[in-house]
From Swiss-Prot:
Any Pfam family: zf-CCHC_6
Record carries keyword Transcription regulation: yes
Location of the protein in the cell: Nucleus
Organism in which the protein naturally occurs: Schizosaccharomyces pombe (strain 972 / ATCC 24843)
Coarse class of the protein's main subcellular location: nucleus
Self-association state and partner proteins as the record states: TFIID is composed of TATA binding protein (TBP) and a number of TBP-associated factors (TAFs).
Annotated protein name in UniProt: Putative transcription initiation factor TFIID 111 kDa subunit
InterPro entries, alphabetized: TAF1, TAF1_HAT_dom, Znf-CCHC_6
GO molecular function terms listed in the Swiss-Prot or TrEMBL record: histone acetyltransferase activity; RNA polymerase II general transcription initiation factor activity; TBP-class protein binding
Task of the protein: TAFs are components of the transcription factor IID (TFIID) complex that are essential for mediating regulation of RNA polymerase transcription.
Phosphoserine: modified positions: 244
Length: 979
């Protein structure tokens, strides 16, 4: 190929040299011989050079097409020609061109010779083969160790630079092919094939010689000595069923066995050895039939029957040791003996009847009473156990302000019903709910779920259960952080019922058929019925689930020092609570429980302050802010019981524990006052405030049975009275009226906890005291005890079923139809029975009172006063009504047309009539006793009393009618002397 052809082939390089003559001139100016250029380019005139690589082409190929030719390469080629002349093939190596004038390299420190090269050569020869490795190592300048590549004949031609450049591409390609056999240009490598795991050969398991099993110890079981068995008191077990029935199938099986084995009592070896074999030898044809007729076994005539029977016994064959009787034989008279049926419920007394002496003196009949106790314990099995209730940590510590020592008037009047007021035209921005993951709350206790007061907010994504009380004023309510359980009670249909149904909310609790109701005797759980119940340590109440309307939601306001935040939240579950049944009674205002709880609350605060104090002392001012209802003098009086006052110098003194007092730990401090005690005390404060607002400034803790009828309903419905009445009624110590004024619903769907007399005082609904009483028998009650108890239980069931039907209604139209549309939208109900327009002030109704005053000049002036508090309005109206009733005579009472007023007048007349009737009966009985008249129509019975002083019959000597009363000499002789 000529030089011009090179330029033509490289036109695409755009180097700027389009004419080959320009390059020729350039080479000539530099003094370069053109023969060298032609030899490098592979001129056609030099055929030997056509086989060499085109250095210039490779130079252009390795360079960027945008760049021009590399002039340094041209200068280098020119210097080669000057040094070697035209015979360029005589060059031995390119290294001679560049390294002649360089100094020799010094040997490296710690040089180990050609060991590294030899190792690398061996590795390469292992991968590529010895011949290919030799070419590679010689091409890159490594020395080939001896023995690695076989010796070859010396090359006829000296390797030149062109040959090295020609082999470089082949060497690279061979190396790539060696390590990457599947390599192709422009194709992605299969890395799964390239980097496949190294194949591993399966190593067979090594054969292990089993160890010799040598027993560590030898145990021999020695049979019991027959002498010991014979001398033992325990007799051998008798062998029963000597006569056993045999079936037809057994007969056939035994007949077949006897046919196949005639000498089953003898061993087979014995039969073979004792058999006469000579008889079976066939000497001629005539003996064939004889042999077939003879038996293979021993002839029966040679065996003694008795001996065979004995052998069977010796060999242990018990098949023929029993007497086999045919039960179908009509001549046999057999009576089958049936197994005796054991009594599963064997009484305790039957076990003692064997000992006649002990049973003879069993006068107290204790076993029968033991049976009664056992039945009673199993009957109330599931109601005696208390479920565990665990409150939050801050609730057990009674953290302020959630647990106060004394509630304010505003907090008492709005007990657990804080008012939510908004400023007019104020913008409300709702914040997103705080995300709380339920997965993090799993397997955590109540203390871990709510460690601080921040976790009790409703403004998070946790599920909310809304429970609405059907009572206007429940007896007891829980505070923040206190836990309650929702228990689903299920009663079994029968003893075999093993089902355990589960609801979406609550835990299941199964009651047996005879178990007592969880609501004591004021509610029942029918067989196969599930009753959800609100359960805690203070109350129990039935729950009735309702569907949540899609338009209802919860508005939450969270107030803090930084402002108020508002949240909107869906209602996940909604329940309506029935009437609450108290578990513990509310203490009275001046009871010992209140005093003890107040002292323990003071001790709790003192112990915690002492732990934080460096010197173990405290000041009165530290306690005053927590007990706002007490002054410093009252606090000092209580501190003197367990603390002493110390003063040093002129400085202020401090209080310190006495030497015999010990500060308990935190657990002991928390146990002094429980959160339930605080709730009971708050309920007592609410009851006191309600009585004071109603005009009863003086509360009564204890009310006797004779005084119940004389007290107004407001005092009888105080929480410390109703709770005590209910607990006594559950224990059978009292009876309740069940209906009437104490009904919290006013429509007969709740129980009245007002106590009534157990001696005929209870009257069912619809029956009054004016009804004709039953005739009284001699030496009997004036009422029928069984009939009264039966009527009492029927009334309880009627009210329970009515409450269940009423609170289970989900349809608003049905609810309005049953109770009346007006009663649903009433804003305020004054009492449990009566609702009047003037006595039902709602939040938007006020009371205006006009008063007359005299000014300083004596003139009358009118002043108008407006009252907004509904409690005060109710007290004013009630007082006004009492004044009007007192000013109105009984003879002037006439129907007014107002149902509420007429009902009050009717009740007033009935009370006056009952009072007059009672006074008349008392006067009549007093007059009859004085005159000696029997009110039943019979005369006065004669008495057998005889006076020991005067001797007359009919009185005693201490009676004033005795003629010798008060005379010490007395006696019958004195009286006769006077006569």
């Amino acid at each position: 190929m000529s030089f011009d052809g090179l330029i033509v082939e490289n036109e695409n390089t755009k180097s700027g040299y389009n004419d080959g003559n320009d390059l020729t001139d350039l080479f000539k100016q530099n003094g370069t011989d053109m023969s060298v250029i032609n030899s490098l380019l592979g001129d056609t005139n030099n055929p030997g050079m056509n086989e060499s690589p085109k250095i210039l082409d490779s130079s252009f190929e390795n360079s960027n097409p945008q760049d021009g030719p590399n002039y340094e390469d041209f200068d280098f080629m020119g210097s080669i020609h000057k040094e070697f002349g035209n015979n360029i093939n005589e060059m031995d190596d390119m290294e001679d061109v560049s390294d002649d004038n360089l100094p020799e390299e010094e040997q490296a420190v710690n040089y180990t010779g050609d060991k590294d090269d030899e190792d690398f050569g061996k590795l390469l020869a292992k991968e590529m083969g010895e011949e290919a490795a030799g070419q590679v190592l010689s091409g890159v300048g490594f020395s080939i160790p001896s023995g690695l590549v076989p010796p070859s004949e010396p090359s006829k031609t000296v390797s030149s630079t062109t040959e090295e450049l020609q082999n470089e591409a082949q060497i690279r390609e061979s190396i790539v092919k060696t390590f990457f056999p599947t390599f192709e240009r422009g194709v992605l490598l299969n890395f799964s094939e390239l980097f496949k795991p190294k194949p591993v050969k399966l190593a067979p398991p090594k054969k292990k010689t089993p160890k010799v099993c040598v027993p560590g110890r030898l145990t021999l079981e020695v049979d019991t000595d027959y002498a010991i068995i014979f001398n033992s008191k325990k007799s051998l077990p008798l062998k029963r069923n000597v006569v056993s029935p045999i079936s037809t199938h057994t007969k056939k099986r035994r007949r077949t066995a006897n046919t196949s084995q005639r000498n089953d009592g003898l061993d087979l070896n014995t039969v073979f050895t004792t058999n006469d074999w000579e008889k079976n030898i066939i000497y001629d044809e005539s003996d064939v039939n004889k042999t077939n007729q003879s038996s293979f076994f021993i002839d029966k005539s040679l065996v003694d029957i008795d001996f065979a029977f004995d052998e069977n016994i010796f060999d242990g064959d018990t098949g023929t040791s029993k007497v086999v009787l045919n039960l179908n034989d009509p001549k046999l008279l057999l009576q089958p003996q049936l197994p005796k049926k054991e009594d599963s419920q064997r009484s305790f007394a039957d076990t003692h009847q064997r000992n006649s002496l002990a049973w003879k003196f069993n006068i107290s009949n204790d076993p029968a009473y033991e049976m009664l106790k056992q039945n009673h314990q199993s009957k109330v099995r599931n109601t005696l156990s208390q479920l565990a209730i665990e409150h939050a940590a801050f609730a057990e510590k009674l953290t302020f302000p959630y647990y106060k020592t004394r509630l304010s008037k505003r907090a008492v009047r709005s007990y657990h019903r804080p008012t939510m007021s908004f400023k007019p035209n104020a913008a409300i921005v709702f914040s997103p709910l705080i995300v709380r993951k339920r997965s993090k709350d799993k397997h955590k206790s109540e203390r871990e779920l709510i460690p601080t007061t921040k976790e009790i907010t409703m403004g998070d994504t946790t599920h909310a259960i809304l429970v609405e009380f059907s009572e206007e004023h429940p007896a007891v309510l829980s505070n923040a952080g206190m836990a309650s359980r929702i228990v689903n009670y299920y009663r079994k249909k029968n003893e075999q019922d093993e089902s355990r149904p589960k609801l979406e909310v609550g835990e299941s609790h199964v009651l047996d058929v005879q178990d007592r109701s969880p609501f004591w005797n004021f509610g029942s759980v029918e067989p196969g019925e599930i009753t959800p119940t609100l359960y805690n340590k203070m109350i129990r109440a039935p729950l009735f689930k309702h569907e949540v309307p899609p338009t209802d939601f919860i508005l939450i306001r969270n107030s803090s020092s930084y402002g108020s935040k508002y949240y909107l939240k869906n209602i996940n579950h909604m329940f309506v609570s029935g009437q609450t049944f108290p578990v513990t009674d509310v203490p009275g205002p001046h009871s010992r429980k209140v005093t003890t709880a107040s002292k323990n609350r003071l001790k709790m605060l003192v112990f915690r302050l002492i732990r934080r104090s460096p010197n173990g002392g405290l000041f009165i001012r530290q306690l005053s802010k927590h007990f706002s209802d007490q002054n410093e003098m009252q606090i000092r009086q209580r501190l003197k019981e367990f603390m002493e006052y110390k003063k040093k110098g002129d400085g202020p003194g401090y209080w310190k524990l006495k030497s015999n007092e010990v500060v308990p730990d935190e657990a002991g401090t928390r146990s002094m006052v429980s959160p339930e005690t605080v709730c009971l005390l708050e309920s007592m404060q609410v009851g006191v405030r309600q009585l004071e607002d109603a005009g009863y400034g003086k509360t009564m803790d204890e009310i006797n049975d004779d005084e119940d009828e004389e007290q107004p309903a407001e005092q009888l419905l105080a929480p410390w009275i109703t709770t005590r009445n209910f607990i006594n009624a559950t224990q059978g110590k009292a009876m309740l009226t069940l209906f009437g004024e104490g009904d919290p619903t006013g429509i007969g769907e709740g129980y009245s906890f007002i106590r009534t007399s157990m001696k005929g005082g209870f009257k069912p609904a619809g029956e009054t005291a004016d009804d004709k009483p039953e005739p009284q028998t001699k030496n009997a009650h004036a009422y029928n005890v069984a009939k009264q108890q039966r009527a009492y239980e029927e009334e309880i069931n009627r009210i329970w079923n009515a409450q269940k039907r009423g609170l289970s209604i989900n349809n608003l139209e049905e609810l309005a139809k049953k109770y009346g549309i007006n009663s649903i939208h009433d804003d305020y109900v004054e009492s449990n029975e009566e609702t009047t327009r003037e006595e039902t002030p709602s939040s938007d109704k006020v009371l205006r009172i006009v008063r007359l005053y005299r000014d300083k000049n004596g003139n009358l002036e009118r002043k108008q006063e407006t009252i907004h508090d509904p409690i005060v309005i109710h007290a004013y109206l009630k007082k006004r009504r009492e004044i009007d009733e007192q000013s109105t005579a009984l003879d002037a009472v006439v129907p007014t047309g107002d149902e509420a007023i007429d009902r009050r007048n009717r009740r007033r007349l009935e009370q006056e009539l009952a009072k007059s009737q009672k006074n008349w009966e008392r006067r009549r009985a007093r007059h009859a006793a004085k005159e000696g008249i029997n009110l039943n129509g019979e005369g006065r019975k004669p008495t057998t009393r005889k006076c020991s002083n005067c001797g007359q019959v009919g009185h005693m000597k201490t009676n004033k009618i005795c003629p010798l009363f008060g005379r010490p000499e007395g006696g019958l002789a004195t009286m006769l002397d006077k006569n």
